[in-house]
Amino acid sequence: MAIVKPFKAVRAHRDKAALVSSKSYDLYTPQMLESKLAFNPYTFLHIINPDYEDHKLELTDKLRFKLVHNRYLEFKEKKVLKKDTLSAFYIYQKITATNSFCGIISATSVEDYHNNVIKKHEGTLKEREILFENYLKNTGFNAEPVLLTYPDNNVVAAIIKKYQQKRAEYEFTTTDKDSHLLWVVDADDDIKQIIEAFKDIDILYIADGHHRSTSSCLLAKHLAKENPHHTGKEDYNFFMSYLLPEKELSIYEFNRFIKDLNGLTPDAFLTELDTFFSIENHGQEIYKPKEKHHFSMYLNGSFYALFLRKSVYNFKETLSKLDAEILYQTVLKPILGIEDIRNASKIMYSQNKSEGLELKTKVDSGDFKVSFGMLPTTIKELKEIVDADLLMPPKTTYIEPKLRSALIIYEF
């Protein structure tokens, strides 16, 4: 039984929604960031870059987060941001050139996270957990929701469809040609239906935002200890999430790029691969895998198809069937000597949306010796691994939609 809760969002006035909201901070190059800050006085980026006009400031994290909080208050005082008077759910739709995503922004329960109603598929880094917890504690808000996915639900789908027939509270297109629409759901009957519908859903799966959710849970635990009148209903007991039906989630694979062959020549490397794979040389013809346990490889000017020898490989449990794990156990670890795939300096990852051409260009540049591609992980595989209480290898999935920051802000 999943707990979802309406909340009073802080958000931009309708005429400034496109100007205030931004892409996630890490998607901006330094040049793009500089341009946004210089020419858009309303962008949320000013809040999270409080010392933009004085780059010489050397601040501790705590002081920087305090300045973020102050800039946030300034945006509210100037009426750039306002807090809704009624608690609501928010239906958000993002339309790209290839996909349309539509789900519900809600407060979700820390208790559900602890009780495994909200399940994760990736591990987190303690250092990042603590950093973001401190950010949340010192700023008092969260501007980027965790992406959760749930099994398709007819009741929720019907409510979303009903609101899509109405005028959106926000409707704008960004320079990347994506369209964004937002509807406010503050009618009591609709709120009750959404709450009841999610009570029938046993599990919500984290698709993106593992550190945000974990940090929110850490913060809730610490604030509860500091509050002698803690009831469990305080806003810090929830975190903002974007709930998206499984059928609308898009999962892409990450390509792997390796800087050296661990002392092997290309021919010796191919010989080592032959233990676990049947190998086809495709020359300059781009090869993309068509089935699970098939891999593409670019080495020494040629594309190769690698087909796993299933009679040799040991399928032990759910995780061992995952292509990213197969590549690690048969190639990256035993042949290329990469033990720690999260932190090893000789491996680089890139999400694959280029039809395989990137496998060639990055190796031909001389920066890498070999590259690998595979089919994307499916939502079915992701759920099987999570339900078996396992974690996926790092950089196994690149999941869309990527959500805008400060379209909706959650205060606690």
Indicate residue ranges for each PLM-predicted region.
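Surface-exposed, charge/polar-rich loops and edge strands
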Residues: M1-F412
